[in-house]
Structure formats: C-alpha cells, structure tokens
C-alpha cells in the first residue's frame, strides 16, 4: 500500500492501519537469498493451485515497452532515494521507500538481459552506497517506534542487496545484532498478522529460524484469508478503511511465498473465498481507477495461479494501458485527492516517492511476473494444513 497512512491519521481520517514453515522451506529460502544472481526467481517450476493456470493475456511487447518507460521515472527519483535523508528531512519511512525503489528495478532486471542487468547494477551502486553508514544501520539503538516502522524494510533491503550482487557482509553483521530484538515478544506482539509473516519470511531468507509459523498466524483472529469478510462492503474510497484488502493481498504474498508454493495452511473453502473476492474487487478498483490496489490483486492471482479469471485479463489490460507520461503508474486524480490530506500534516512529503513509486513497483511486478516466472505444471490440490 502507498505510504501516507500516518499522515492521514493525523489529518483526522478514520480507519485501521494496515506452523507452516518447515525446515525444508527455510532452507529453500536461505538458498534463494544466498544467490547473487537476479535470475533465481525463475529457476524452478511453480507448483500449481487447484484452479488451472492459463498464460495471461498480457502483450509481451507492450509490457517490455512499459518496463523500459518506467526506467525513466525510476532514474528521475535517484537523487531522492536516500533512506536517512528521507526520514530526517521529509518525515518519511526512508528504508521503506529505498526497498520499493530497489524492488521496482528488480522487476525490470528480471525481464531484461544480462547486459541490461549490469547497466542497472552500475546505476544502483552509488545509491546502495548511501546505506553504508551508521545512520542507516541504526536499528540496534533506535526507538521502539522507529524499529517497528523500519525493521521489515531493513531485512528486505539486505535480501535485495544480495540479489543484485552487492556485498552484504556488514549488513548481515548488523542484522545479527538485532535478531533477538526482532523476535522478542515486546516487538512481535505489536505486529499484525501479515507483518509478522513478512518478518518470518525475510528472516528465513537470511538464514534465521524463530518466530511463529505461518499456520499459527493463519489461525489468529483477523486473518482475512481465513475469516472471509466481504471486502466489497468496505468504504473502498477511504485509504484507511480499505486496509483489509491490503491485509489479504499481503497474507497471500507470504502464504504463497510470492508464488513459490501453493497457498499454505488454507482449505479449498479459503481458496474459493480468495478467488471470489479477487473477481469481485478487481472491477470495483478498475472503475475507481485505483491502480495500486488493482496491481496487488493481480499479483495475488499470479502467485495463486488463478490467471484464468476473466477479471485478471481485464485488469492487466487496464494496467498496461494506463501508464503515466513520465513512466510512472498511479491515477493523478486518485493520488491527488489523498495528497491533500497528507500534505496538510507533512508539507515536506514527496509525492513521487511516497505514492507513485509504490504504485509503479507493484504494477511492474503484476505485469512482469508472467514474463519471467516458469510455466505452471499440472493443476494439483494445494496442501491444506488446517
């Protein structure tokens, strides 16, 4: 979800802020993290879900052109992507936006050739170098609030550094210092379900055990995928009230490990609910021109191997044809309405970084994933650990 929720709360908006892990799974994730080549994501066949996956109706050439166009927008942001300065000077979650920036480039790398990857890595090198400071590696001594805001992004950035082939020796040493604090009840008890899943997932990518398993988290009150609320009845024009939609998308990200496994811990009833909700929500967000939410729902369908839904093809077509002139994604009117509330409480907020960057990144992921992910195998029933 685009950032700005804290600012919108202060502006008086109402709403809510946004064990199935086997040793074998942890080993697989650690092996992925250890690989310094961006090709690892497509290195093995994805396991199919109960619904047959069809090759998405996304025009490859248009998607490639859109990714190339997005490079112009990402390059224009380069001077602003300094996580320490974003927090100090703009009151923004600098590590979060740094990760969103690297993640967007990662998608472009994964659909490009080796020569393009080398060029992008060289471009990113001086930006990555901005993080080799004590001010960036500050979480061992940070306040509880800053720690809570930054730790998931901090772990994710280390994984991304490794994937791009940057040295992570110091980074891993700094992470080792804070793992006990990450796993302490004083921290984990303050996290929501999807955030805790994210922490467990990233720690396993970095070779650490600990924390609750996915299925323990799945059984907790409030898990959207298990509780089956009707998300279409939310006030979907209110960025905070629609937060359960993002809770669902993020639960699916981690329960599928971004498409690497079937939906863990879930029953066929849960899968039917997820399929129905995505089919119902996508047309709503298309009408509202809410590209950010739309892209995350498409990402889910990619990971769930549910690209046979007609709403999937419609949403992909909308995304590929609604790129902004500067290469970004995000409806100007939709983001402009949110910006009014955000800028009232934080005049230093950078809209291009805080809003358009996230939407651009998730749209790239939604469109590019089918181009680099392996073809799905025969449809099989997912493992349902109840």
Q: Model-found features: residue ranges?
A:
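Long, well-ordered core segments of solenoidal/helical folds
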Residues: 62-88, 120-140, 168-186, 208-238, ...
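Extended, basic/acidic-rich, low-complexity regulatory helices/tails in eukaryotic proteins
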Residues: 55-58, 88-89
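An alpha-helical repeat/solenoid feature that recognizes helix-turn-helix modules
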Residues: 88-114, 138-167, 188-211, 237-263, ...
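Short, solvent-exposed mixed-charge patches
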Residues: 381-386
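N-terminal secretory signal peptides that target proteins for export/translocation
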Residues: 1-24
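Bacterial N-terminal signal peptides
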Residues: 30-40
């Amino acid at each position: 979800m685009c950032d700005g929720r804290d600012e919108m709360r202060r502006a008086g908006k109402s709403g809510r802020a946004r064990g199935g892990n086997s040793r074998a799974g942890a080993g697989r994730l650690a092996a992925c993290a250890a690989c310094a080549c961006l090709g690892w994501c497509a290195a093995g066949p994805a396991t199919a879900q109960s619904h047959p996956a069809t090759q998405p109706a996304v025009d490859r050439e248009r998607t490639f052109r859109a990714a190339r166009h997005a490079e112009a927008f990402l390059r224009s942001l380069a001077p602003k992507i300094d996580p320490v300065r974003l927090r100090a000077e703009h009151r923004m979650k600098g590590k979060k936006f740094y990760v969103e920036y690297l993640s967007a480039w990662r998608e472009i790398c994964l659909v490009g050739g080796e020569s393009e990857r080398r060029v992008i890595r060289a471009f990113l090198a001086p930006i990555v170098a901005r993080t080799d400071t004590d001010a960036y590696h500050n979480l061992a001594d940070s306040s509880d609030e800053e720690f809570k805001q930054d730790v998931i992004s901090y772990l994710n950035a280390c994984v991304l550094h490794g994937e791009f082939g940057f040295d992570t020796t110091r980074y891993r040493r700094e992470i080792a210092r804070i793992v006990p604090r990450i796993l302490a009840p004083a921290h984990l008890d303050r996290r929501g379900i999807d955030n805790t899943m994210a922490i467990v997932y990233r720690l396993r990518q970095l070779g650490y055990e600990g924390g609750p398993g996915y299925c323990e988290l799945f059984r907790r009150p409030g898990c959207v995928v298990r509780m089956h609320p009707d998300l279409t009845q939310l006030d979907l024009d209110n960025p905070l009230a629609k937060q359960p939609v993002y809770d669902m998308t993020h639960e699916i990200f981690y329960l599928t490990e971004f498409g690497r496994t079937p939906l863990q811990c879930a029953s066929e009833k849960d899968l039917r609910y997820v399929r129905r909700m995505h089919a119902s929500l996508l047309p709503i967000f298309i009408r509202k021109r809410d590209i950010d939410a739309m892209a995350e729902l498409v990402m889910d369908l990619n990971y769930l191997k549910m690209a046979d839904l007609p709403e999937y093809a419609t949403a992909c077509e909308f995304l590929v044809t609604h790129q902004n002139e500067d290469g970004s994604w995000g409806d100007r009117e939709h983001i402009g309405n949110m910006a009014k509330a955000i800028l009232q409480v934080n005049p230093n907020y950078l809209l291009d970084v805080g809003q358009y960057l996230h939407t651009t990144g998730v749209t790239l992921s939604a469109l590019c994933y089918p181009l680099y992910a392996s073809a799905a195998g025969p449809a099989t029933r997912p493992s349902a650990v109840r």
